[in-house]
Amino acid sequence: MNAEHCKAYTLLQEQQIDDIHAHGYLLRHNKSGARVLLLENEDDNKVFNIAFRTPPADSTGVAHILEHSVLCGSREFPLKDPFVELVKGSLNTFLNAMTYPDKTMYPVASTNDADFQNLMHVYMDAVFYPNIYKHDEIFRQEGWSYHLESEDGPLTYNGVVYNEMKGAFSSADDVLERETFNTLFPDTPYGVESGGDPSCIPNLTYENFLNFHQTYYHPSNSYIYLYGNMDMEEKLAWMDEKYLSHFNAKEVKSEIPYQKPFAETLDIVHEYPVLDGDPLENNAYLSYNMVIGSGLDVKLNVAFSVLEYALLDAPGAPVKQALLDAHIGKDVYGSYEDGILQPFFSIVAKNADENEKEKFLSIIRGTLEDIVKNGMDQKAIEAGINYFEFRFREADFSSFPKGLMYGIDVFDCWLYDENKPFAYLQQLAIYDELKKLAKEGYFENLIQTYLLDNTHASIVTLIPKTGLAAENDAKTAEKLQKYKESLSKEEIEKIIADTKELAAYQEEEESEEALETIPLLKRSDIKRESIKLYNDEHEVDGTTVLHHNVFTNGIGYLSLLFDTKNVPNDLIPYMGVLKSVLGYVDTEHYTYGELFNEINAQTGGINCGLQVFRIPENDDDCRRMFGIRAKFLYDKLDFVMKMIEEILNTSRLDDEKRLHEIISSMKSGLQNRLSSAGNATAVMRAASYYSPMSNFQDRIAGIGFYQLLKDLDENFDEKKVELIKNLQTLMKYIFRKENLTVSYTADETGYAPLEEKIAAFKENLYTDEVEPGSIVYDFEQKNEAFQTSGQVQYVALCGNFEREGYDYTGALRILRVMLSYDYLWINIRVKGGAYGCGGAFGRGGNACISSYRDPNVGRTLEVYRGIGDYVRNFEADERQMTKYIIGTISELDVPMNPSAKGQTSESAWFNGITEADFQQERDQILDATLDDIHALADLVDAALKQNNICVVGSEAAIQKEKELFKNVENL
């Protein structure tokens, strides 16, 4: 790009950023004052992001509600939900919007040039010219409104953000995070909840909502980011001509102020909700939180990420271990909250006794003082630095575009100092510097300065209170009832009329004219070829070795996968324990802390996990694999094999104290995941009533597994002998050469030495004689509800269409998009107020529908049962069909990094899926007609009529409709 050609902009900075292989430009738009950052490189997965500094003054959630609302129609795209139309009919690789404590951003990504331009256009129009000024229904739908259907009915609140935040305020971990922000930053925007506190959201007026947009959504307060391989000059000219030149620069007071440091540490106690029957003793959270300098100090921030690893995250880390040894909490963890002006460091003990707060603080201080006096464990620091450097170099962000993540990183400085946008993109020199400084007392000085001598800190104690959620619900209901009683007949009729008017607005069909404002690609714009698989099969002394031959930039991704088909049924759940024990207990030559640090000092990590695959020729069973995965530079293959042998052959599985620590930590983590991802939990459990894959997953990672962990934790002394015996027995069943399949992602150079290493590795596997066992699937339609202390629900309905005689077809992928962004979106989210909803249809015949942070239960199930009729009566012209097809293809065509190419190929091989199968599915999608969609109606009806239900949610909502369930219990 030649910045001199861009006369509407002033070039402020230009530099080559070798760490991420990009050329950076910082510009200012002359007329509007917009800040613009460009990262030019060869990446075809292009990213656009427009963000605004949006400091909230209160906890009404105005920034969050506005983030939802601007995407509900604009000047050039006057639909009710252009965002959804884009999801349905765009080839995007990312499309979303996010509210942070101090900023709101609107990022999009696509590999298709025309599609990328369309996405930019819709988003620029949305933020600068939204329809919120024309339609107050948008505010009432997305934010909050009074809901009243009849004079005699209950007055309630409804709104997408309102219900989303009710879900967010249900989790103890979320409560702790909010109280930490509140205590550390009482005089800044960080001291309020940008997402919105459900008790405050109804205080937001429509006028204040509009004022917030007028104040902050101006180019002078904007940060525009472009990344990738594109004509940057053309994009700059388009933005200038179409939008930015229509605004004059103005002063926007949105700077984020520093919190004045405290003279002494703040100490507060706060309650969080638990259910009747949940323990009150040893169920508190103790948290010590310290503000760490400024986010503008990149080296300090990288160093504290390393310190979090070395002090708290790594197994055996000194602060964590000291607290566990003193029985302060059953789970101890740390967090370093960055991405804000003043990052903070937290040490948390969960399932603790609130009366041991002083002991908690004393142990932390004593341990840190000892480290300062005697020095850090240099291997732990080396491992921490290598861990973060490896991640930075690898730049593997899973399915998220690399440019998106870099675009989020730039805000860590750019938002607070507009002259430092590139700071967080250049970290390799910092890692080199930290390696030298580690030997000179640098980290010890950080501990003394920021963790020991720092009074800008808070101690937050969360204590459980039974019935708090019900108490809060009752207060809200009472407040609404009193308000209703204060209203005149005319005012009540007005609320009823408003409720009906909002429903009518939501049900109003979009006009063809409005729909056609959203640009749409043609079917012919989509490539016909399906994905390529990389599965070169080799035989090494009877063992299958899969070589996924792709360029990996010198990194090898190794998977040793062991078939567990002969594991006896009673040992199946203990595989879920074993995967979290191996690598985290002492071995012959290392303590578990030394082992973890040695591995992370030389590799990108070695991890164990369980995977389940279909057996296409046998729907009554599944393939269950225990995997050991490692990633490393090619020259570390010897080391990796040696460490895996050390773990498999010499792990101390009889260390009772360590096993109990691991079980307690696993239980704590799984409890959080089951509640926070309640939709996935409910789907897994409902499908476990009939599906071999889900039944197995539930027993090793779901509610069934949680029940085992709870029993082991609470009755450890009685169960420990059996636990140890089961783990030792499992080793002999699993880690045998006849069970092994190897999967390796590397180029030819990386692969060359592997076969010899595998042959040697197999000689050291178990050969003990064992009696082959087999899994027994305990299928039963349980139709359960699991009560949590939350205030919203996660509702799942599942069935299997293959058992009803129907076959999988690519058209089911189109149906998934139709349901997720049309039928379910309108009925569950827009009308029902849930935050999320979706459907999934698998090759094995599974059909699963679920909702997320949903205020309803029975109403939602009724909507699900209407899917068949919706499909039967679905009408679409060629344009609409094309839109759904494009949206479906965008889900298939996610750009893959080397690791993902290897994992996709491996998964396809185990599932028995070929390139021809993928091609057939793609052809079925691209050639789909309205008749193909209609043909799915009976399939859906047949599957969902099996009526496998599971709900995770609030006690009040579940008890109100308990007749829907065969069994109700606390989670």
Where in the sequence are the language-model features?
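His/Glu-based metal-binding/catalytic segments typifying zinc-dependent metallopeptidases
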Residues: 40-42, 49-51, 162, 166-170, ...
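M16 family metallopeptidases and their MPP-like homologs
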Residues: 45-55, 81-129, 136-147, 174-199, ...
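Active-site His/Glu-centered metal-binding helix of metallohydrolases
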Residues: 62, 66-70, 578
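Hydrophobic, small-residue-rich alpha-helical packing segments that form membrane-like cores
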Residues: 150-221, 225-243, 247-275, 280-282, ...
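Extended, regular secondary-structure scaffolds
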Residues: 211, 223, 232-251, 374, ...
